[in-house]
């Protein structure tokens, strides 16, 4: 993605086929410095949108996985998409981050992407064994109402382990609760 954002490669050149029936434009450690390098580039907030326009017609959906920080990379992702699915960890600081994200989404709608919509909100690290989960769910449902998905992603060590084995959860533990939850979400 780094090469695409700074103009060294086209999206069509960066696409990789996977064994999971999805195409991926991967990331690497060079992406970490992209925000700084893009500061002086013209149209820096719309570079991903422009790059993806070339391949958009070839796909029904393009998913952009943004980092949790609200930096230039996230700004590019949100400027390039039609809607956002907000994962909310059932933890206290997630509410603070959510408040910042909502403010950022309003700014992006105003300045860069008037079509940006909130597709929905999905709870992650969900466990009713914790009072905090119930509190977070109540607060988020109060604000987002019907945008909150019924599907929740459970707190699970298997979900945490899967990436370290280079596998999505539905391959790492296909019959597990985490895998089933992600399949329900899809």
Q: For each predicted feature, which ranges?
A:
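P-loop NTP-binding core
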Residues: 1-186
